[in-house]
Swiss-Prot record:
PROSITE patterns: AA_TRNA_LIGASE_II. GO terms for molecular function: ATP binding; histidine-tRNA ligase activity. SUPFAM superfamilies: Class II aaRS ABD-related, Class II aaRS and biotin synthetases. This is Histidine--tRNA ligase. GO terms for biological process: histidyl-tRNA aminoacylation. CDD domains: HisRS-like_core (cd00773), HisRS_anticodon (cd00859). The keyword Glycosyltransferase does not apply. It catalyses: tRNA(His) + L-histidine + ATP = L-histidyl-tRNA(His) + AMP + diphosphate + H(+). It is found in: Cytoplasm. Keywords: Aminoacyl-tRNA synthetase, ATP-binding, Cytoplasm, Ligase, Nucleotide-binding, Protein biosynthesis.
Length: 424
């Protein structure tokens, strides 16, 4: 007997009872984005590998260890996208969206990284990102943070996420800091783990991200990035902090926050939570003013963020159990008796014509009225429309409220209006 084929480890199926909750959450996210004037862009899942090497950085963990890369039949190296910003910038350049233009874009979809699967972190994961091009002031950085704060309020999780900020300055400022940090680390190599020793020369800022307690203790005495910031970056960061204070958004400055992708400059931020166990990032981003030019476009200021939807869904479920998926079905049409099945189908179509916003399902599985009512309950229906031979003959229908148990008989021509009143 052939072995059953199963999903690849770390790449999950999401079943209807799960996707209903996802759809409600995504609907809120998209509604807020629309309210801030963002437009959707849809991007390929597969891109040329050099795009990510140039954008993310060849010595990052993502490029070195986590990308799904393969050669196509023409020998071209392709990669399943590990993140969305690089593809969004590529599309903006390719289609002329960024030349002397301001753009506010968002995207959503699956990303791929070869990581050890764990709760909230998978090899195929879903990410929603927002990117702004053509604006260089701290005000747009602040607005992106305000947008995300509005999400947390709408989802009922504001008390469970905290904002951390930092400025990593200009390319020149980071280079000066990098030299100082490497000099410090060289003096304390015996306290570094193997991973930090490897990063010390290839990507020393990533040592600041180490989860090793001994390394974190050592870094308390390390040079601070803020001491090396250029004047423009300092002014930009101070402006951002002032705007957030005026907006009533609490934050913590985390000088070890550097982000794991090489394209960032100036502002970087993360929304973090401890409500899923160890501290985890829910949403993160920052400025990447040099990336458009780096990928072949004209110099264009840019800022954006991305959020992992798996982790967001887990957080909503953990801290706001009252947040439920919308009802799968509003109305369930039940029939029993000679000639009633076709009448039920026709009635359902008339109701859909009159009230297209309703979620309506017709029973085609047979069974007596009791069994069909049980099916209606299983689907979460609030109302049952019941047709027997007598109702069909009289052009009537029984409307049953499945929550209160109350029912009434109406003319079929009146049912759409009645449903609108019952279901709001």
């Amino acid at each position: 007997m052939a072995k059953n084929i199963q999903a690849i480890r770390g790449m999950n199926d999401y079943l209807p009872e799960e996707t209903a909750l996802w759809q409600r959450i995504e609907g809120i996210l998209k509604q807020v984005l629309s309210g801030y004037g963002y437009s959707e862009i849809r991007l390929p899942i597969v891109e040329q590998t050099p795009l990510f090497k140039r954008a993310i950085g060849e010595v990052t963990d993502v490029v070195e260890k986590e990308m799904y890369t393969f050669d196509d039949r023409n020998g071209e190296s392709l990669t399943l996208r590990p993140e969305g910003t690089a593809g969004c910038v590529r599309a903006g350049i390719e289609h002329g969206l960024l030349y002397n233009q301001e753009q506010r874009l968002w995207y959503v979809g699956p990303m791929f990284r070869y990581e050890r699967p764990q709760k909230g972190r998978y090899r195929q994961f879903h990410q929603l990102g927002a990117e702004v091009f053509g604006l260089q002031g701290p005000d747009i950085d602040a607005e992106l943070i305000l947008l995300s704060a509005r999400w947390w309020k709408a989802l009922g999780i504001s008390e469970h996420v905290k904002l951390e900020l930092n400025s990593i300055g200009s390319l020149e400022a980071r280079a000066n800091y990098r030299d100082a940090l490497v000099a410090f680390l060289e003096q304390h190599q015996e306290k570094l783990d193997e991973d930090c020793k490897r990063r010390m020369y290839s990507n020393p800022l990533r040592v600041l991200d180490s989860k090793n307690p001994e390394v974190q203790a050592l870094l308390n005495d390390a040079p601070r990035l803020s001491e090396y910031l250029d004047a423009d970056s300092k002014a930009h960061f101070e402006g951002l902090c002032e705007l957030l204070a005026q907006a009533g958004i609490p934050y913590t400055i985390n000088e070890r926050l550097v982000r794991g992708l090489d394209y960032y400059n100036r502002t970087v931020f993360e929304w973090v939570t401890t409500s899923l166990g160890a501290q985890g990032t829910v949403c993160a981003g920052g400025r990447y003013d040099g990336l458009v030019e780096q990928l072949g476009g004209r110099a264009t200021p840019a800022v954006g963020f991305a959020m992992g939807l798996e982790r967001l869904v887990l957080l909503v479920q953990a801290v706001n159990p009252e947040f439920k998926a919308a009802a799968t079905i509003d109305v369930y049409v039940i029939s029993s008796g000679a000639g009633t099945q076709s009448a039920a189908m026709q009635l359902a179509e008339r109701v859909r014509d009159a009230a297209p916003q309703l979620k309506l399902m017709t029973n085609y599985g047979g069974g007596n009225f009791k069994k069909q009512i049980t099916r209606a309950d299983k689907w979460g229906a609030r109302v049952a429309l019941i047709l027997g031979e007598n109702e069909v003959a009289a052009q009537q229908v029984v409307v049953k409220d499945l929550r209160s148990g109350e029912q009434e008989t109406l003319a079929q021509s009146e049912v759409a209006v009645r449903l609108a009143l019952m279901l709001g």
